């Protein structure tokens, strides 16, 4: 440890972590080198929001509990054999146990609390005592790839918004949103890709500057008038990062009778203590108050969220297509007395659920070689294997042209049950025959069709009322473990905060071996199949049709599925 005594063990400004590149291994095999590199990649300064504090994204979403735990995880992964499994409890390596070569090399449980105690107050006490860590979704599960990880999902959402509200034509229209953090930072690029202009309000100027540097936002403004002028004067879609507080800017538009075409928000409202700046407060004052009076920070932040949501509701009344983008801001406003906070829909039931019914979601992969050419070759392979999807091809072309890699080169690509296994096998074969310089890892966001229970986001408004049933992500994690994913994670509270979600993740390493091919066949079929199963069980016809076509064995539905074939 390099911290002085008395310092926060999660802070070390002397460290710069980057994943190794190339084919030389620090671990005993690629199956343990893969999680080692992806853990380090999560903390690359080009990837993480606050790497010196182990914070990857999403408020306080961390990769390890503290630096001592990080060092010990690295040490264990370097010595771990291919018949052993490391257990990680909220960012702390707690055990190594004998398993077998087809078992996961790492099993991770982050931020899980018994339901009665599953709230921010109890979590924060445990966090202060060094007993827990908030893993968000891909922070503590070591498969964050920077803002690209959410770009395509956001792009797909905005394209759906254009189709639903504007006959598919976003020309001359603009989006108002808040938040340019690790997730929200994807919005400006996704918006312009979909043909919209955007004003994204952000209170932390360094985040706007970072998005400018990495090509995710086009311009910076320091006043609403300046931002509006930039949009008005541009002949092409343009994104503007506006320095300010969303709780101030959104009501200003109401007062000035200016109605955006689309309104949403991706501030870190899920965490009122650490993720949302109260009205009238500076960043430094908020930092001081978090040390002095947490309850006051939370209360004041939630009051400010209520102001913002009230403005969003008014803009919706005036004709703006308004949607919640999964940060639980409606819930926070409801708790502050905005009784109609849920009058605008969440993005999943409004725009994404039909994709989930076919197991389509945020499939992603990263090149452990560190060579961008490996990603470009896999891009081409995706086009070869899925030749009849021009929308997907267009996405891949735009991604190559407009998205800068952060850390290890990676790609996000929304594909479903019928394609994930085929792509995984193709990538594994490319490693085997030397077409790729090193193995790739395939993972996904926890925001996927079968891996999350989140009543205010992914499972909002389920047809059968099963929004809060969290058996499904538990079954997903168990099945991915049985199938032999390289590492599997089970988290609580990602996206929407403590008490509001449970979710699971998996990553599988394509090392070119025959064993990997067998594991890929199981994992990359079963993982999206659980999403089809979950939605078919809830009564969705699209999911039932997909289950029938893919010959899933769903005991309670098999007689019905036979009639659909």
Curated annotation (Swiss-Prot):
Record-annotated residues binding NAD(+)?
A: 58-59, 136, 182-184, 202, 207, 245-246, 266-270, 276-277, 325, 495
What is the protein named? Urocanate hydratase
Q: Belongs to which family?
A: Belongs to the urocanase family.
Q: What subcellular locations does the record give?
A: Cytoplasm
Q: Which cofactor does it need?
A: NAD(+)
The record's EC number reads 4.2.1.49
Q: Quick one: a GO cellular component term?
A: cytoplasm
Principal localization reads: cytoplasm
**Species this chain originates from:** Vibrio campbellii (strain ATCC BAA-1116)
Name the catalysed reactions. 4-imidazolone-5-propanoate = trans-urocanate + H2O
Q: Which gene encodes it?
A: hutU
């Amino acid at each position: 440890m390099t911290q002085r005594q008395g310092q926060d063990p999660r802070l070390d400004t002397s460290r710069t972590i980057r994943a190794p590149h190339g084919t030389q291994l620090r671990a005993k095999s690629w199956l343990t080198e893969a999680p080692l590199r992806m853990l380090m990649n999560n903390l690359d300064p080009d990837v993480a929001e606050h790497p010196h504090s182990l914070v990857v994204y999403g408020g306080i979403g961390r990769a390890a509990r503290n630096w001592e735990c990080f060092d010990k995880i690295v040490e264990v992964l370097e010595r771990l054999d291919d018949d052993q499994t490391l257990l990680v409890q909220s960012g702390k390596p707690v055990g190594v146990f004998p398993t077998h070569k087809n078992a996961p090399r790492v099993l991770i449980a982050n931020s899980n609390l018994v339901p009665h105690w599953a709230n921010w107050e109890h979590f924060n006490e445990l966090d202060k005592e060094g007993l827990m860590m908030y893993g968000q979704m891909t922070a503590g599960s070591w498969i964050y790839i920077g803002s690209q990880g959410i770009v395509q999902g956001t792009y797909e959402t905005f394209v759906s918004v254009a189709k639903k509200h504007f006959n598919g034509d976003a020309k001359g229209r603009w989006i108002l949103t808040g938040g340019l953090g690790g997730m929200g930072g994807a919005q400006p690029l996704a918006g312009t890709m979909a043909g919209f202009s955007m004003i994204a309000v952000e209170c932390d100027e360094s985040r706007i500057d970072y998005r400018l540097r990495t090509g995710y936002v086009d311009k910076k403004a320091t006043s609403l008038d300046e931002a509006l002028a930039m949009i008005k004067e541009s002949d092409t879609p343009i994104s503007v990062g506006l320095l300010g507080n969303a709780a101030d800017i959104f009501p200003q538009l109401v007062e000035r009778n200016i109605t955006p075409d689309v309104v949403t928000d991706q501030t870190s409202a899920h965490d009122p203590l650490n993720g949302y700046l109260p009205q009238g407060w500076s960043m430094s004052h908020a930092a001081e108050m978090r040390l002095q009076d947490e309850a006051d920070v939370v209360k004041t932040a939630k009051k400010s969220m209520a102001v913002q949501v009230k403005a969003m509701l008014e803009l919706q009344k005036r004709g703006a297509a308004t949607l919640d983008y999964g940060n639980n801001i409606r819930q926070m406003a409801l708790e502050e007395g905005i009784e109609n906070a849920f009058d605008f829909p969440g993005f999943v039931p409004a725009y994404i659920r039909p994709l989930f019914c076919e197991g389509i979601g945020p499939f992603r992969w990263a090149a452990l070689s560190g060579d961008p050419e490996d990603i470009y070759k896999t891009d081409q392979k995706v086009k070869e294997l899925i030749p009849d999807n021009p929308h997907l091809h267009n996405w891949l072309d735009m991604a190559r042209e407009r998205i800068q890699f952060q850390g290890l080169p990676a790609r996000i690509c929304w594909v479903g049950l019928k394609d994930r296994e085929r792509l995984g096998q193709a990538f594994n074969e490319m490693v085997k025959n030397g077409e790729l310089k090193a193995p790739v890892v395939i993972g996904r966001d926890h925001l996927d069709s079968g891996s999350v229970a989140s009543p205010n986001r992914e499972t909002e408004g389920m047809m059968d009322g099963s929004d809060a049933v969290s058996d499904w992500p538990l079954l997903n994690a168990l099945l991915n473990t049985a199938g032999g994913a390289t590492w599997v994670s089970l988290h609580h509270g990602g996206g929407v905060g403590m008490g509001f979600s449970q979710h699971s993740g998996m990553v599988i390493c394509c090392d070119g071996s025959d064993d990997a091919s067998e594991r890929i066949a199981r994992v990359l079929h079963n993982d999206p199949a659980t999403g089809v199963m979950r939605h078919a069980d809830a009564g969705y016809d699209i999911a039932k049709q997909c289950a029938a076509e893919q010959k899933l064995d769903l005991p309670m539905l098999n007689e019905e599925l036979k009639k659909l074939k």
